[in-house]
A protein has these predicted regions:
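Accessory alpha-helical/coil subdomains and C-terminal extensions
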Residues: 99, 107-112, 118-133, 153-292
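Glycine-rich oxoanion-binding loops at beta->alpha junctions
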Residues: 52-106, 115, 154-156, 168
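Glycine-rich beta-alpha junction loops
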Residues: 43-47, 141-145, 187-192, 216-222, ...
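Gly-rich Lys/Arg/Thr-decorated short loops/hinges at beta-loop-alpha junctions or inter-strand turns
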Residues: 2-9, 69-82, 141-151, 178-181, ...
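C-terminal non-catalytic interaction/assembly regions of soluble proteins
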Residues: 256-410
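Short glycine/serine/threonine-rich phosphate/pyrophosphate-binding segments
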Residues: 15-25, 49-50, 85, 93-94, ...
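N-terminal phosphate-binding or glycine-rich loops at protein starts, especially the Walker A/P-loop
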Residues: 2-54
């Protein structure tokens, strides 16, 4: 059989282990020289591919350099937020597949979240329509953990570890003074509160901070919120409150919109930020206590020093599994994670495949049964779910300047 080439791209927001998934795809691809002639990378995703921004991994990351991907945050190949047309009749599709043919592409991999799986769906359906032999596989990625039909996603474990660690550190800082204070920590999560829920992992004992966790799965009432804080001050001096950026009221209005209007991105998603600052001002004006807000922002997804070893290992495994599946003829699928336990009840994960058409444009939220009846905490079921995903540390090599050594695209 004539050799063909493999191409891989990254899309959407990066994570601390999206490059580990990339390493898994590339390293596995390079172990099949009898079948795969070249392993290419799309610089800036499908948008860069349109503009012929392509690299050959054997030239770009020779030898041991490839392994450096596993401790480098960000997206080595760069990213994009390009949305393919809904209609498969659009001329963009034949133009794309002409480029695939010119590059002798046999396998296409896209590492990303919900919108990226939409791209995988469209390309695989168009390939089937025209009888193209190209195999199209989606590799999951998102710190939001909101992809359906998978136990969890690569990137969530490391982001959850960062959130829990940072919340514990902020709690330690807030406890310095014996003066009533409220610290509000705003955490990423538009409609799904998985990452904010992970702040519960910071607690060292029952009743420890963060005392309040507000997720977008439950409507937020600012008057009830203020009453809850007043009651908590009867027993606690310093209160830590963790909120998802996407918390909203019963009418569906985002709390961040109380203070200002918000724009939208290329996919029509509202660009949320600022609910923490709004609540800070609310607490200060209504309760008359010291208030501070902290927005974790992009640091949640780019902390190499707190990469979960479990997350990294699973991301690499997913990348390798996807290549093996594609070589076996699979297409139009996303690699999924299936949770299992060994004979002693310890956490294990195995990979599976799911129809990408059942995944794209769907969203997995935190089950309401994992949120307490008062709406501002999570249950032990969530703790048991999330704790295995943050386990283990990795060693990040340091340079002569004492700072982490990452690999960069030239």
């Amino acid at each position: 059989m004539a050799k063909k080439n493999l191409i891989v791209g990254q899309s959407g927001g990066p994570t601390a282990v999206i490059n580990s998934s990339l390493y898994g795809v590339v390293s596995e691809g390079l172990t099949h020289p009898d079948t795969i002639e070249h392993v290419y990378g799309m610089v800036n995703g499908i948008e860069g591919f349109f503009n012929d921004h392509i690299l050959d991994f054997e030239e770009a990351l020779p030898g041991d350099k490839l392994k450096w991907l596993t401790h480098t945050p960000g997206a080595y190949l760069g990213s994009c937020r390009y949305k393919l047309p809904e209609s498969l009749e659009d001329p963009v599709y034949p133009a794309l597949f002409k480029k695939f043919e010119e590059l002798n592409i046999g396998w296409f991999f896209y590492i990303g979240g919900n919108d990226s799986m939409d791209t995988v769906s469209k390309l695989s359906r168009y390939a089937e329509r025209i009888g193209s032999p190209i195999r199209v596989i989606g590799e999951p990625k998102t710190i939001d953990n909101d992809l359906v039909h998978t136990d969890h996603t690569p990137g969530f474990g490391s982001a959850a570890k960062y959130v829990a660690s940072t919340v514990r550190e902020i709690t330690t800082d807030a406890n310095v003074y014996e003066k009533k204070s409220v610290t509000i920590i705003e955490i990423m999560g538009r409609h799904a509160g998985w990452l904010t829920a992970a702040s519960a992992l910071a607690r060292k004992y029952d009743g420890d901070n963060p005392l309040f966790i507000y997720l977008p799965e439950v409507a937020f009432d600012q008057d009830v919120f203020l009453k809850d804080l007043e009651k908590a001050f009867e027993k606690n001096c310093n209160l830590i409150v963790c909120v998802s950026e996407g918390i909203h009221d019963a009418d569906g209005t985002f709390i961040c919109e109380y203070d200002s209007s918000v724009g939208t991105d290329t996919f029509g998603h509202k660009m949320l930020a600022g609910c923490g600052k709004y609540l800070e001002n609310l607490v200060r004006s209504r309760l008359g206590v010291k208030a501070r807000s902290v927005e974790l922002n992009v640091s949640q997804r780019c902390s190499a020093s707190l990469i979960s070893a479990t997350d990294q290992k699973e991301a690499i495994t997913a990348g390798k599994f996807g290549v093996q599946a594609a070589l076996n003829g699979e297409t139009g699928k996303m690699v999924s994670f299936i949770r299992q336990t060994d004979s002693e009840g310890n956490y294990q994960m195995v990979c599976g495949l799911e129809d990408v058409n059942a995944i794209c444009n769907e969203e997995k939220t935190v089950p309401l049964t994992w949120i307490t009846s008062d709406g501002h905490n999570v249950t032990e079921d969530f703790i048991r779910y999330a704790r295995p995903l943050i386990q283990g540390n990795i060693e990040v090599p340091l340079g002569e300047d004492g700072l982490p050594k990452f690999v960069y695209r030239k």
